[in-house]
Amino acid sequence: PQMMNTMAPRVDPAGPGSLTEAFYADPVRRYMIPVFSDRRTDWASHPQATRDSLHEHDMWVAEGLTHRYPTKVLAELLPTCPQYCGHCTRMDLVGNSTPVIDKLKFVGKPADRLGDMLDYLRRTPQVRDVVVSGGDVANMPWPRLEAFLDQLLDIENIRDIRLATKALMGLPQHWLQDDVVEGVGRVAAKARARGVSLAIHTHVNHAESVTPLVAEAAKAMLEAGVRDVRNQGVLMRGVNDTSVDLLDLCFALQDNAMITPYYFYMCDMIPFSEHWRLSLQEAQELQHAILGYLPGFATPRIVCDVPFVGKRWVHQEDSYDRVRGMSFWRKNYRTSIEAEDVDALSREYVYYDPIYTLPADGQAWWREQGDALAAHDAAIARATASREASALALG
């Protein structure tokens, strides 16, 4: 109901079908209640799209614990959410299997999985930052979540804890329950006594979703003692793909709910998401367009989550082939699966633009590629050769 009530909220009936038309055009509807006609018929999915596009499962060091960055881990406590988004980057884990898709499932018992996560963190002192997610932590009974957080706070090397919950926007009533507010207060007090930063990260994509109840829930969390409530939105066509949309959302978050605009992620390369995705060039232009309107601490960074690399500001690409829609990225650290990979820090990693955004010759090139893996390898070779030629010319 929280989401439904924000769809086409101020449309006056103007004859038969007018409300239906407004409902279909609504930006919140476009990503929360997708219909088949939303999808593109030319490129419904990118040839490089995968169900675990960030390879988080490959980097599990314990079941559900992804060690992707040098000092930070992602703890996926459970595979369910109060609401399911079509653009979910963890679509391969979150939600139930269907007759068509057999999803990844946790094997271990919840208590055993959480215990294994804590054991890994105790014996891995370089980890200081834990994103506690899922799914959505709001779907975990509060006593179990508090018990996990309490044990997490007993680990000396942990200095930052972030609770990831879209439910702060989609089901704010959860975070207003007395037992939850009181429990957050206890966890926040322990974190403060230990000098640990405790924050909540939510996921709001449009200004219409910042309702009075969302604002009440966010303020309740701040009053309970969390250091900050931050927003990590996703950049999506037809939802928030203009500077006006983004600024309206940021002002609503700041002014109405005391939520800090933090990141906007480019939509990940998962199947059937092309109608939402923007090109890197479009993201760069949007980042430029929103600068100067907000305080520096509340100016969100638009980031590209590059497979095997991690999130990078959209202007950090190493090179960019705009005809074929391929941006090339490097990194300065190894993931948990690359300890023996001598080329990890010199390798080129690729992010792909939606093919329909490319010029005609770029789209034609992709139509000729029968082998997606070969196209990927060819792109890497082409970029490498171009840089080597430039180096020789400068040399």
Regions found by a protein language model. Give the residues of each.
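Conserved AdoMet/S-adenosylmethionine-binding subsite of the radical SAM
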Residues: A111-P125, D129, G135-L294
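Flexible, acidic/Gly-rich N-terminal and inter-domain linker regions that tether
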Residues: P1-R68
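Hydrophobic/aromatic-lined pockets within catalytic cores
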Residues: A8, D12, G86, L93, ...
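Short regulatory "switch" loops immediately downstream of catalytic or recognition motifs
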Residues: M3-P13, D92-V100, R186-A188
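Auxiliary Fe-S-binding modules of radical SAM enzymes
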Residues: P1-T20, Y24, L247-G395
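Generic hydrophobic, aliphatic-rich segments that mediate packing or membrane embedding
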Residues: M3, Y24, Y69, V73, ...
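Canonical Radical SAM [4Fe-4S] cluster-binding loop centered on the CxxxCxxC motif
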Residues: H67-G108, L163
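A short mid-domain helix/strand-loop element embedded in enzyme catalytic domains
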Residues: T50-G64, P82-N96, G115, Y120-P125
